[in-house]
Amino acid sequence: MARIAGVNIPNHKHTVIGLTAIYGIGRSRARKICEATGIPTDKKVKDLTDPDQDALRKEIEKFLVEGDLRRETTMNIKRLMDLGCYRGVRHRKGLPLRGQRTRTNARTRKGPRKAGVALKK
């Protein structure tokens, strides 16, 4: 297994698909990285030579990936929450941020249903 950006890349997959195991690299960015390094996209990860792996590492270092990207994302959310703006309040309450309805639906963001209180007759 090739280890790039602190992540073990699966050996049996094509290079483009294997690079998507790194947080912050999707299919399109992986394809651009392969083009920039001159590595064929259909080449398997196990067939990469050491110079190929080094070239991939150098190209990936140019992007914000893994821990740094996660840290920046959480800091951005924390900043919104500290500001007390609408988006920050919605983050704090665990509700949708972008204007979706919440009377029904929004179950993913709100979590499982809570049991309602039944009134005595």
Curated annotation (Swiss-Prot):
Q: What Gene3D superfamilies does this protein map onto?
A: 1.10.8.50, 30s ribosomal protein s13, domain 2
Q: What is the lineage of its organism?
A: Bacteria, Pseudomonadati, Pseudomonadota, Betaproteobacteria, Burkholderiales
Q: Which SUPFAM superfamilies match?
A: S13-like H2TH domain
Purpose: Located at the top of the head of the 30S subunit, it contacts several helices of the 16S rRNA. In the 70S ribosome it contacts the 23S rRNA (bridge B1a) and protein L5 of the 50S subunit (bridge B1b), connecting the 2 subunits; these bridges are implicated in subunit movement. Contacts the tRNAs in the A and P-sites.
Q: Which family does it belong to?
A: Belongs to the universal ribosomal protein uS13 family.
Q: What does the record note on quaternary structure?
A: Part of the 30S ribosomal subunit. Forms a loose heterodimer with protein S19. Forms two bridges to the 50S subunit in the 70S ribosome.
Gene Ontology molecular function terms on file: rRNA binding; structural constituent of ribosome; tRNA binding
Q: Which gene encodes it?
A: rpsM
Protein name, per record: Small ribosomal subunit protein uS13
- Look up and give the organism this protein is from: Ralstonia nicotianae (strain ATCC BAA-1114 / GMI1000) (Ralstonia solanacearum)
